[in-house]
């Protein structure tokens, strides 16, 4: 019943003909995928979540605040052009982090606030990953790493992040594939406890 576009663009490749991003040097897509997906979601009574634009600056600098500026324009532009679709059901704030990251609280808060303000309060969510032992670079030779996050540190860092964003972010879907199977219960318990504390929904990914 739900379809989520995890990002509307990455660096120069975009899913819809954004006049703002085209001026910034992005490539014109051959098909307006956003219009296509929303039309199909309308047809099949599905709820569509729009994923924000990822400029790539965060991956290069580890500072999430770089993503705020472009998305100010993207959020307004997308809602004005596509917000009439009955299936447009919410927003995915696509900066994917795992730990207390520079600029994260400010970025999630500002982007979440704008998404909700333009769309009369449609829901927003994030999907960070848990920095477990399997969270290694795909380009590297190692399958695991020694310096994985502890449950206690994960709880401490995400308590601080949720405290700063819960007013404008409705749900959090932690990516759990980076931790070991026998760690799932402990992390899930903490995630649910934190979500309940701040009135957020706890999803998984």
Give a label for each model feature.
Residues 1-205:
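Glycan-processing catalytic domains of CAZymes
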């Amino acid at each position: 019943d739900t379809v989520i576009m995890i990002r509307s663009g990455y660096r120069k490749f975009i899913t819809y003909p954004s006049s703002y991003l085209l001026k910034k040097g992005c490539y014109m897509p051959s098909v307006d995928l956003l219009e296509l997906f929303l039309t199909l979601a309308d047809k099949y009574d599905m709820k569509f979540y729009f994923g924000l634009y990822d400029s790539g600056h965060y991956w290069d600098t580890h500072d999430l605040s770089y993503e705020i500026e472009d998305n100010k324009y993207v959020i307004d532009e997308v809602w004005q052009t596509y917000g009439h679709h009955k299936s447009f059901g919410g927003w995915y704030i696509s900066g994917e982090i795992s730990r207390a990251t520079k600029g994260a609280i400010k970025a999630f808060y500002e982007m979440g606030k704008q998404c909700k303000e333009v769309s009369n309060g449609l829901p927003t969510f994030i999907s960070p990953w848990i920095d477990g032992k399997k969270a290694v670079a795909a380009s590297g030779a190692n399958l695991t790493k020694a310096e994985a996050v502890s449950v206690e540190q994960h709880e401490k860092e995400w308590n601080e992040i949720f405290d700063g964003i819960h007013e404008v972010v409705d749900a959090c879907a932690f990516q759990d594939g980076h931790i070991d199977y026998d760690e799932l219960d402990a992390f899930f318990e903490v995630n649910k406890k934190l979500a309940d504390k701040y009135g957020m929904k706890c999803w998984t990914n």
